Amino acid sequence: MSKEWKGNKKSVSTMLGMSTTWHPENRAAGDYYTIDPTAVEDFMQHLKRNYCDTRYYEELFNVVWEPACGCGNISEVVKKYANKVISTDLYDRGYGHTGVNFLKTTKLPEDCMCIITHPPYSLSDEFIKHAMELLPRSARYFALLNISYLAGEKRFNDIYKNQYLRAIHIYPYRINCYKNNENTGHSSPVNYAWFEFGHKPQNYYSEDAKYPAKIYWIEK
């Protein structure tokens, strides 16, 4: 059974190598969207089906970090699949450990091999770069992003050319994503996918397969 990591703000900041903290006067801008938990459930079931190496799957989801946890929609689902979930956020949404700026952390939680989050869209590039700085070779970073995140010359040069995109897990149907966690009852007009990043394998050398990202479809 999954356990939520407990600790005070100081212990969390120390654990993640972060010296700066959030202050009550800070408030989030409008870049706050939450995903419907049923869509997270579909994704986690999809991963469980597609990771053929059961031992690696268990290692990957032993300790999971959600660094932009918001109100906990992702964390609460992942807790059913992981041994431990550490939930942090810069802002106080009433869930997890607040005042933790992911971009200022210098180390992972102990035994963490997986970061999974729905990052602020305006900071998507920075989240990817920082996650790749923190993660060891066999670890993974999963980010929920607009499918259009694949496009753009600048992004190609800054992200895809230098990082290792392992897979794209696409929702073939529209999922519910709520601004400021306000359920309007309508599905999002945006198409979403989970982008899976990881470092190049140690024996990776083929120039002919420079960007071997796989495409998966998430079925209900």
Positions of predicted regions on the chain:
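Class I S-adenosyl-L-methionine-dependent methyltransferase catalytic core
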Residues: M1-K220
